[in-house]
Amino acid sequence: MKFLVLALTILLAAGTQAFPMQADAPSQLEHVKAALNMYIAQVKLTAQRSIDLLDDTEYKEYKMQLSQSLDNLQQFADSTSKSWPPTPRSSAPSCDATATVRAEVMKDVEDVRTQLEPKRAELTEVLNKHIDEYRKKLEPLIKQHIELRRTEMDAFRAKIDPVVEEMRAKVAVNVEETKTKLMPIVEIVRAKLTERLEELRTLAAPYAEEYKEQMFKAVGEVREKVAPLSEDFKARWAPPPRRPSKSSWLSTRPSARP
């Protein structure tokens, strides 16, 4: 791909000298300016397209330098064109000459494009060829590595599966064995706790009876003190007895006749 960089450099150098100005022909100044600007624009466009085909990883620095050179060339052409003194508008023969030069420039651009197209195709073909070669070299190694890891995993699984099953069976047996050894300890602790609880109940029984008697005595005393108050309350707030009416008194009076 370095030949492409060299070709672009030669193309830029040739483009800058394709149309030398004639100082002794001021009548052709506008014609030369137009032709030069158009040619430089076409050269820059074609060169930029060719630069874009270069690989960014390998030719990144060259691409930046060439792009900067193209920009500098365009700026130089613009500044030079603006610095030239103005001239009268060209006549009809001058316009014909400009059209002829424009046609020649377009022809040169098409020729360059035609010449670069096969080179670009060849470059693409070479790159694809190299990539295929790399893939053919690396693909067996990658497959071998994958198969090796798969084989190692299968072998490891074949070794660990029986161990896992054995451990599962041992865990079940060990749980029963542990339970057998643990139950006597649990029974001893439970018996000791039961014994201590009975001792506490025996020790607390007299105190409970005494507390019960004191509670009954206190309740009786409270009841004796509250009973007079209750009777007095009933006497104070009880409704007065009903007096019999006159009709009822006459009806209940004994008759005078025998």
Swiss-Prot record:
Tissue-by-tissue expression: Major protein of plasma HDL, also found in chylomicrons. Expressed in liver, intestine and muscle.
Superkingdom per UniProt: Eukaryota
Name listed for the protein in its UniProt record: Apolipoprotein A-I
Job description of the protein: Participates in the reverse transport of cholesterol from tissues to the liver for excretion by promoting cholesterol efflux from tissues and by acting as a cofactor for the lecithin cholesterol acyltransferase (LCAT).
Keywords recorded for this protein, A-Z: Cholesterol metabolism, HDL, Lipid metabolism, Lipid transport, Repeat, Secreted, Signal, Steroid metabolism, Sterol metabolism, Transport
Positions of region (10 X approximate tandem repeats): 64-258
Subcellular location: Secreted
Chain segments carrying region 3 X approximate tandem repeats: 32-63
Biased amino acid composition, Polar residues: 246-258
Gene Ontology CC: chylomicron; extracellular vesicle; high-density lipoprotein particle; low-density lipoprotein particle; very-low-density lipoprotein particle
Annotated signal sequence range: 1-18
GO terms (BP aspect): acylglycerol homeostasis; cholesterol efflux; cholesterol metabolic process; lipoprotein metabolic process; phospholipid efflux
Family the entry assigns: Belongs to the apolipoprotein A1/A4/E family.
PANTHER family for this protein: APOLIPOPROTEIN, APOLIPOPROTEIN A-I
Start-end of each Sequence repeat: 64-85, 86-106, 107-117, 118-139, 140-161, 162-183, 184-205, 206-227, 228-238, 239-258
An MF annotation (GO) of this entry: phospholipid binding
InterPro entries for this protein: ApoA_E, Apolipoprotein_A1/A4/E
Region (Disordered) location: 233-258
Species per Swiss-Prot/TrEMBL record: Salmo salar (Atlantic salmon)
